[in-house]
C-alpha cells in the first residue's frame, strides 16, 4: 500500500512539472509570434530597404530594421550662413527574444542643391524681417494715439508698405511655408478686428464733454421730476435726455457723479437720496426745486 501511494505521488509530481514547462513554452511561442507579427505590421513604415536586395527578415526568423535620420543645421558666420548635415543610421536586429541595436553617426556638408534652397529661405526670411521692422517703425512714428493709449491703429500703415510686405510674405509662403498660410491669415484678421474695436472704444472716452447727450445701458436712469418741470424732449419711456436753451435737464445715475455745462446752461446729475436744486437762467423769480428718489417727500409746485 505504501509503495502504491508513493508511486502515485511520484507520477503526480512529474505531471505537474511537465505542465508548467509546456505552458511556458506555449506562452513563449505565442509572445514570439505576436511580437513578430507586430514587427511585420509596424516596423516597415519606419525602415528603409537595404541596397543589397535582401529581405529585412532573414530565413532564420531574424528581423533587421534600418532607420536613417538626417539633421540639418544652419550656422551664421562671417562668410554667411553655412549648412551642416548630421546623418544618423540606426540598425536594429531582432532574433527571437534578443534584440541588438547599433547607431552610427556621419557628419558632413549638404549637397549644393540643398545649400541653394536654404540660402533662398534665409534671404526671404531676412527680407521680410527687415520690411516688417520698417513698417512697424513708420506706424509708430505716424500714430497719434499710440503715445496716449499704448497701441497703434491699422489705418496708420500706408498701402505701399502693406503691399510690399504682403509680396515678400506671399513669396516666402509660396516657396517654403505653404502649410502655414491659413494660420497667418487668421492671425492678421484677428489683429485687424482688435485694432478696430479699440478704435471704436476711443470715441466714448476721449470726449467727456459730450456725454450728456448719450445714454449707456450700464447706468440706470431715475426720473423724479414733476410733470410741470419736464423739458419738452424728456420722455419717461426713454433713457436719453437732451438739453436745450432755456430748459434744465436732470438725470440720476447710481454710482456716477458728473457736472457739465453747455451753452451757458447748467446740467446737474444727482445721486439717489440727494436733492438737486436748479434755477432756470433768463427766468428770475421762478426757482425750481426738485428731488430725486425720495419716497417720503413731495415735489413742491410753484405757480408760474
From Swiss-Prot:
Entry's Pfam families? Answer: DUF5569
Annotated region (Disordered), positions in chain: 1-28, 91-115, 138-160, 190-304
Tell me which stretches of the chain form a coiled coil: none
Residue ranges under compositional bias (Low complexity)? 195-206, 229-248, 264-292
At what positions is Phosphoserine found? 39, 158
InterPro entries under this entry? C10orf62
In this chain, composition skew of type Basic residues spans 1-10
Question: Which UniProt keyword terms apply here?
Answer: Phosphoprotein
- Which stretches are tagged as biased composition: Polar residues? 91-101, 208-223, 249-263
Q: Does the keyword Phosphoprotein apply?
A: yes
- In this chain, composition skew of type Basic and acidic residues spans 16-27, 151-160
Has the keyword Phosphoprotein been applied to this entry? yes
As given in the record, the signal peptide range reads: none
What name is this protein filed under? Uncharacterized protein C10orf62 homolog
Q: Which organism is it from?
A: Mus musculus (Mouse)
> What lineage does UniProt assign to this protein's organism?
Eukaryota, Metazoa, Chordata, Craniata, Vertebrata
Amino acid at each position: 500500500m505504501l509503495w502504491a501511494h508513493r508511486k502515485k505521488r511520484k507520477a503526480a509530481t512529474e505531471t505537474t512539472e511537465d505542465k508548467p514547462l509546456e505552458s511556458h513554452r506555449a506562452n513563449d511561442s505565442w509572445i514570439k509570434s505576436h511580437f513578430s507579427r507586430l514587427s511585420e505590421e509596424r516596423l516597415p513604415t519606419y525602415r528603409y530597404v537595404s541596397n543589397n536586395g535582401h529581405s529585412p527578415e532573414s530565413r532564420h526568423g531574424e528581423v533587421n530594421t534600418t532607420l536613417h535620420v538626417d539633421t540639418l543645421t544652419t550656422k551664421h558666420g562671417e562668410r554667411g550662413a553655412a549648412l551642416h548635415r548630421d546623418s544618423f543610421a540606426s540598425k536594429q536586429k531582432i532574433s527571437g527574444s534578443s534584440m541588438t541595436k547599433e547607431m552610427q553617426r556621419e557628419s558632413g556638408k549638404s549637397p549644393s542643391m540643398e545649400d541653394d534652397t536654404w540660402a533662398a529661405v534665409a534671404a526671404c526670411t531676412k527680407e521680410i524681417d527687415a520690411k516688417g521692422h520698417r513698417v512697424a517703425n513708420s506706424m509708430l512714428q505716424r500714430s497719434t494715439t499710440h503715445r496716449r493709449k499704448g497701441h497703434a491703429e491699422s489705418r496708420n500703415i500706408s498701402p505701399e508698405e502693406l503691399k510690399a510686405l504682403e509680396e515678400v510674405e506671399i513669396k516666402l509662403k509660396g516657396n517654403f511655408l505653404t502649410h502655414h498660410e491659413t494660420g497667418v491669415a487668421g492671425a492678421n484678421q484677428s489683429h485687424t478686428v482688435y485694432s478696430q474695436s479699440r478704435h471704436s472704444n476711443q470715441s466714448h472716452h476721449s470726449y467727456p464733454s459730450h456725454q450728456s447727450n448719450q445714454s449707456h445701458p450700464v447706468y440706470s436712469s431715475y426720473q423724479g421730476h414733476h410733470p410741470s418741470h419736464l423739458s419738452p424732449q424728456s420722455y419717461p419711456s426713454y433713457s436719453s435726455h437732451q438739453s436745450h436753451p432755456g430748459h434744465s435737464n436732470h438725470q440720476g445715475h447710481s454710482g456716477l457723479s458728473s457736472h457739465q455745462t453747455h451753452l451757458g446752461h447748467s446740467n446737474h446729475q444727482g445721486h439717489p437720496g440727494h436733492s438737486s436744486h436748479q434755477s432756470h437762467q433768463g427766468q428770475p423769480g421762478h426757482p425750481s426745486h426738485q428731488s430725486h428718489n425720495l419716497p417720503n417727500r413731495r415735489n413742491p409746485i410753484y405757480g408760474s
